[in-house]
Amino acid sequence: MITTERLILRPFTENDAADLFEYLHEPMVHCFFDMKISSMDEAKEDAVKRMENDCYFAIELKDTGKVIGEIFVHPDGEGMEEEDSEGGYSDDTYSPCWILNKDYHGKGYAYEAANAVFDYLFNEKGARRLYAYTEDYNIASQKLCEKLGMRQEGLFMEFISFVNDENGDPIYENTYQYAILKKEWDKCDK
């Protein structure tokens, strides 16, 4: 569990299903369309799946206990790591992504949560590099990446498709990649 001034970042519980449904029944960004939930039963199943995966952090408001979103932290190259000197695996690169209930946008919660998770990854998990993808139309997420000290590494044209047009053909999106190294994070004014 990670705590900030206003938030608790913690594993999901079954009791989070209603809040999960609230922000995933109509995702605003295409990359989350495959996570769309259509019923409370699906929300309960998804809450259990998130409970069983330590890559998910529920973003809970300290003062109300409401879950307003999540941060998912994917270890890069999962399953493809090179063995370390002791015969185990090490991974020093992570790809965080975040989604918040639209009613809580613009209040600094995404920054507060991501900042705390970045600090955790760099200082507790030994991360060397973090990177994030954001669609070219998602200006708020681009600004968040920049506020977190990330630099834009590139723009991938027609990189991925999450939706189809009326004929069933994929609509490809342009995607920015942002990244930050541990040594850059250490110099950031947090």
Spell out what each predicted region is.
Residues T13-N15, D46-K49:
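Short linear motifs in intrinsically disordered
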Residues A47-E60, V67-G69:
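A short helix-loop-beta-strand connector motif used in the catalytic cores of GNAT acetyltransferases and
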Residues I37-S39, V48-R50, S85-G88, Y131:
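Short, charged/polar low-complexity linear motifs in solvent-exposed/disordered segments
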Residues M28-V48:
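Conserved GNAT-fold acetyl-CoA-binding loop/helix
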Residues M1-C31, E60-K190:
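Acyl-donor (CoA/ACP) binding surface of acyl/acetyltransferases
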